[in-house]
């Protein structure tokens, strides 16, 4: 199981291949890559802050919970911080399990956690200024199903 919190870009195809190569015995692998969205057409950047050490521990704990709950063979979580532009990869989740239902459920669980509870603070930067991103009710509701 790997948890990476990094400023550097990652290549999701290469990460997925490396993950698959190490998932011996898996019957299913699910990967998800999230991108910085520009819903308004005015986003210049997304600035993401975190508390080093605490963030990695929190994500590792939830990844371990997913591993035990869905009997995962392996899991990978990558989340970037720093200044990211529109359409840049911001995070990746990969899960490997004996069966697809477990791999999909664990991946969704991890994505819901990252979206609503992981200790990241996001600020949208536009030509008009910068605003902190507030948690969305839909994200909290998604996490509530677990």
Curated annotation (Swiss-Prot):
Broadest EC class assigned to this enzyme: transferase
GO terms, biological process: Mo-molybdopterin cofactor biosynthetic process
Keywords, ordered alphabetically: Molybdenum cofactor biosynthesis, Transferase
Reactions it catalyzes: 2 [molybdopterin-synthase sulfur-carrier protein]-C-terminal-Gly-aminoethanethioate + cyclic pyranopterin phosphate + H2O = molybdopterin + 2 [molybdopterin-synthase sulfur-carrier protein]-C-terminal Gly-Gly + 2 H(+)
Record keyword Transferase present: yes
Keyword check for Zinc: no
GO MF entries: molybdopterin synthase activity
E.C. numbers: 2.8.1.12
Pathway: Cofactor biosynthesis; molybdopterin biosynthesis
Gene3D superfamilies, alphabetized: Molybdopterin biosynthesis MoaE subunit
Cited Pfam families: MoaE
Binding-site residues, substrate: 35-37, 99-100, 115, 122-124
SUPFAM superfamilies with a match to the protein in the record: Molybdopterin synthase subunit MoaE
UniProt signal peptide: none
Function: Converts molybdopterin precursor Z into molybdopterin. This requires the incorporation of two sulfur atoms into precursor Z to generate a dithiolene group. The sulfur is provided by MoaD.
Family assignment from sequence similarity: Belongs to the MoaE family.
Designated name of the protein: Molybdopterin synthase catalytic subunit
Organism: Cereibacter sphaeroides (strain ATCC 17023 / DSM 158 / JCM 6121 / CCUG 31486 / LMG 2827 / NBRC 12203 / NCIMB 8253 / ATH 2.4.1.)
């Amino acid at each position: 199981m790997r948890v990476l919190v990094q400023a550097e870009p990652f290549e999701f195809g290469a990460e997925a291949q490396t993950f698959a190569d190490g998932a011996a015995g898996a019957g299913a692998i699910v990967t998800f890559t999230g991108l910085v969205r520009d819903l308004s057409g005015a986003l210049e950047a997304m600035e993401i802050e975190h508390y080093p050490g605490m963030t990695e521990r929190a994500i590792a704990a939830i990844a371990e919970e997913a591993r035990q709950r869905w009997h995962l063979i392996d899991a990978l979580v990558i989340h970037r911080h720093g200044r990211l532009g529109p359409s840049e990869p911001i995070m990746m989740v990969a899960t490997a399990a004996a069966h697809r239902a477990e791999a999909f459920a664990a991946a969704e669980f991890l994505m819901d956690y990252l979206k609503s509870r992981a200790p990241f603070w996001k600020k949208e930067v536009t030509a008009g200024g910068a605003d902190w991103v507030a948690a969305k009710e839909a994200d909290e509701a998604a996490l509530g199903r677990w």
